[in-house]
Amino acid sequence: MRTCFIFLGTIYFMLNAISLHAQKKPLDHSVYDGWQSLGERKISPNGQWIAYTIEVQEGDGNLVVQRFDSSYQLIFPRGYGLDFTNDSKHLLFKIKAKYADIRSARIKKVKPDEFPKDSLGIINLITLAIEKVPNVLTFKLPKDSSGVYAYHSSKSTDTLVRVLSDSVSIKKDTSKKSIPQIIEQVPDPEQKRKLSPKKKNDESESDIELDADEPGTPGASVPEGTDLVIVDYLHGIKKTYPLVSDYLWSDNGKILLLETTTAKRNTTLKPSVLIWRAAENRIDTLLVGGNDFRGFTIDKNGYQVAFLAERDSAFKSTQKFYKVWYWKNGDPSARILVDRYSKGMNINWVISQDFSPYFSKSGQRLFLGTAPAKPVRDTSLIDIDLVKLDVWHYNDEYLQPYQLRNLDQENKRSYLALVETASGNFRQLADTDMPQLMVSNEGDGHQFLGVSDKLYRKSMQWEGGTRKDIFSVDPHTGKRTLIIKALDGIPMISPNARYIYWYDMEKRHYAVRVGERNLPISTGIKTKLYDEEYDMPSEPTPYGVMRWLENDSLLFVYDRYDIWQLDPQGKKIPMNLTKGEGRKNHISYRWVNTDPAVNYLKQDQVIYLRQFNEKNKFSGFAQMNIGVPGIPESLQMGSVSVGGLVKAKQANSFLYTRERFDSSAAVYCSYDLVSGRRMSTINTQQANYNWMTAELVEWKAYDGKIATGIVYKPEDFDPKRKYPMIAYFYETLSDGLFNYLAPAPTPSRLNIPFFVSRGYIVLAPDIRYQKGYPGKAAYDYVVSGARALVKKGWVDSTKMGIQGQSWGGYQVAHIITRTTLFAAAWAGAPVANMTSAYGGIRWESGMNRQFQYEKSQSRIGATLWEKPQLYIENSPLFHLKAVKTPLVIMANDNDGAVPWYQGIEMFTAMRRLNKPVWMLNYNGEAHNLVERKNRKDIQIREQQFFDWLLKGEKPSTWLKYGVPAIEKGRNWGFETVLD
């Protein structure tokens, strides 16, 4: 009997040991860097190839290239920036330098020129040959054609020059310097450059004379250009041009525009603008000499070129005047099209150097930017004698901080103008009275949309935005016709310019300008076209516009679930295109744009929709014929989160992603979106760790409404155990039920998978607000949710914590003044005192914070002097005597959203009251942590804090004793206190 007992005991011990060995380990802080995610994703135009990047949080990722049928796969370490040629014959991509090499260079503080450089990868998708080119800055492909590409090297090779005969030939003038027009590299076996002793048949020496106004010569501070390589793989041509600083393809690939610089060792070479003609394989010179070229543009057909050039001033001049230069096919060289003296130019206005010109689709119009000339800077003034002062005036359009924050943008502000390319007629369209202009029909429209908020800017201080006057602008004359005044809404113009239309936030409808009247076109719809759950004290935002039908014949808009068809003439009653199927089943249908090049829908076009079930959070894809109203055909729907749908240009081949809370995002391919083939698998190491499950939970909140949230449980969850719990919240999070959450050092949000893996339950409750009582709403939903979980029997009511960042941080701070339920609280960037925060500045934008309380997220809905009691009631600072929960505050001294003195107010008050409180100030950090080292640091501190108070582990020294300033940078306080 004794022997049997010993034997059975041995078996039990062995089985228990095996069970323990099989247990999955919890996540720790070492896992972050290698955790993977999907990055770029593309499908070849013919639908036969896909490519995507797999990125890691810190380190080197991979580029994966696969046949659509999964029959072939290539993996390229560090590949990114991928693009297929339009004929699907090649894939080009960049290859990053190794992360370790870049990090080493940063540590050694090497010069930028000596940093490790990217390379270029080229795959021939027909032969599967692979080419790697080192030291490449960029590569470019024509948008709409194939057969050619170009890449820009970061290196300049030693070069002797000779002039190409196919350059434009202009008669020599021996009284002026003559300069070589273009140089071609001639490689020898040692990859050195030397002069060829014999000219090829298509080459001869020629010169071009300098411009008549003798342009200035750039100084040494202008970077010298580097080699540009042009490849015509259809004809086996490969040419290298040195000293290139910029380049641009025409959409059809017929021409390549090049900008070249002077050479440090050959100052007779002048900066130039050139074009390479693909058909003739030759270079033409458009312009030689100048201080600065910029804003290059080519028309859609590759027949016209325009750019800005500054050629007249000294290189270091404080005032420069740019001109618009223009070339069309057949011209011997570029000519001036517009300058500051052109007829129609406003007095004392100039061509803006900060606006890149562009052609209309037809090429008949060239759009450019102009601006008032800036006053000449007085260089006689000595900086140390200048007073540094901001003068705030009560009639300023914008507050001084807003002006200063946007100073660079304002200095670069440009006003749209156009010039007719055939006649050269110039026309100013926008100006300081009407600064915004939206063109239509790709620049060829008969009317444009003008917008002005000039009369309403002051009220942005408390409104958060501005009302707008809306104009119809005639591009032929510049005449403006007022359409609607003081609109609180969203103005738009139809693709073909037939209609100016808008959503009116106050009247809550869509309206269209028809003839001389403004016509509401959605008033016949009984369901709301605006956010039904909007709970801020301002007008609700619309669900939005889907698209116009071709010829501007119909407008499609969304309600919460369905798609509506509106007649812009108001003659046909609005039609529910999806027949109310969405609302009936709580499914929202949203169009997925699978052809970004087209800005309208065609009659009888089959469109693809993402469908999302609001009740169970399932998602998938559906399709319908836009010309046949009816129930969308569901293609796939399930307990996953789908997205990223891409369609091949020339085939019914689709690429998309699927993910779940327990499975990383994966790339899928499909021919019909009904069945899909999984193409990628990442984060296989997850199988070694105790992961998490996620489920929806409902309970009755204290305001009497049914509340919803997500409960995250450990994979090895045992309902017989009592778990510590952390509630994490912001506003509403439950729609993300199936989103995959990677373990990562966060900007200061809760690292949910990390804590769940280590034995915590996490509750993410949705919060519904009532105007004037945001703090009470947080209490009603968070506390009721926590207690509802306690009733389930597997949450320890004495070991519960709360965590939130920003708006969530404020709610954490408020909740602990209302209850002692929680044993630990963590508040990132909280507002403690609404009365002092109300008049503060959001330094990142320069905006005053008043709008946030009166109209936006803080949801008070009144000014401080109208309802001061609400500001006090909702401010944690005034109720801190009741606090018993230990609190950690993160308040960073470069926070541009919540003034960090809010954290100081809360910390110093709790310290004065002898309440347990800590504050973390990451020096120089923003509202949300940016630097990865700081994100890693805060993850460790959050774990130590919650483990101490919710798991009973020993505290670390920063919690027990703090970190004195004298030890800053030497002692981080992570060590465990052993006494």
Question: Where do the model's predicted regions map?
Answer:
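Cap/lid segment of the alpha/beta-hydrolase catalytic domain
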Residues: 524-533, 673, 681-799, 803-806, ...
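Catalytic P-loop NTP-binding/switch module of NTPases
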Residues: 676
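Glycine-rich His-Gly loop
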Residues: 453, 612, 659, 728-732, ...
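Bacterial Sec-dependent N-terminal signal peptides
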Residues: 1-24, 831, 840
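Hydrophobic/aromatic beta-strand patches that form the interior of the parallel beta-sheet core
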Residues: 230, 427, 449, 668, ...
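Beta-propeller folds
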Residues: 12, 21-653, 659-663, 669, ...
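Active-site-proximal cap/loop segments of hydrolase catalytic domains
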Residues: 742-979
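Short strand->helix junction
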Residues: 263-264, 312-314, 716, 734, ...
